[in-house]
């Protein structure tokens, strides 16, 4: 039997580029929580759809936010 053709998933659009955001603020924890998994890990670019530069900015902002105790390093869920 022949396999059906494989469809490529649609490329996700960077939310920051779409909204023309120039600065990712580490104090905006509601926005940063979208880029953190339930275990507290920073989600990958292929999952979030961010471009390279904004993914770097998000990672830096999350790390700064953790350092300032605005976001947890790990989750309490087990």
From Swiss-Prot:
Keyword Isomerase: no
Top-level taxon in the UniProt lineage: Bacteria
Record's GO cellular component terms: cytosolic small ribosomal subunit
Pfam families, sorted: Ribosomal_S18
Annotated GO biological process: translation
Family: Belongs to the bacterial ribosomal protein bS18 family.
Protein name: Small ribosomal subunit protein bS18A
Organism (species): Streptomyces coelicolor (strain ATCC BAA-471 / A3(2) / M145)
Gene name tied to this protein: rpsR1
